[in-house]
């Protein structure tokens, strides 16, 4: 799920709305991942509260934030490595890296109106994480950023 998982202004109970949004994947027992959108906090939960709820749901691969990043802006910044097919030469190897970054909600800079953006702490985490992965797997695997 790629952000704006609920419509905050109509969500009188954000947790209930999130449960409904992810119910099809949960019922089908499909592993899934989510990242926050700029409106997810407009209901009854804060941005952190929304992500805390998401990471407790069944079959989610979502993470609150990377454990090694003690100071990082936003909630739900993480990466997932997709491994190759069992029985292939790529089994147990990272063939695709998915990066999930919280771009925030609204600008906190008065001179810049509109929506938020990826912050330097997140850029640094991305650079460090992708560099470690490149060294570990000793080649450039593909990556996608959400």
Predicted features and spans:
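N-terminal active-site segment of His-dependent metallophosphoesterases
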Residues: 1-16, 20
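Active-site beta-strand/loop signature of hydrolases that rely on acidic residues for catalysis
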Residues: 1-6, 37, 141-146
């Amino acid at each position: 799920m790629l952000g704006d998982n609920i419509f905050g202004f109509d969500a009188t109970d954000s947790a209930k709305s999130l449960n409904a949004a992810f119910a099809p994947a949960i019922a089908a027992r499909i592993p899934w991942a989510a990242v926050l959108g700029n409106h997810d906090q407009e209901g009854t939960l804060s941005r952190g509260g929304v992500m805390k709820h998401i990471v407790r749901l069944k079959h989610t691969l979502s993470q609150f934030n990377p454990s090694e990043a003690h100071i990082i802006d936003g909630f739900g910044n993480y990466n997932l490595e997709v491994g190759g097919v069992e029985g292939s030469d790529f089994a147990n190897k990272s063939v695709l890296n998915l990066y999930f970054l919280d771009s925030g909600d609204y600008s906190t800079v008065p001179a810049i109106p509109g929506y938020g953006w990826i912050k330097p702490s997140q850029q640094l985490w991305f650079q460090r994480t992708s560099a470690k992965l490149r060294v570990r797997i000793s080649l450039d695997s593909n990556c996608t950023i959400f």
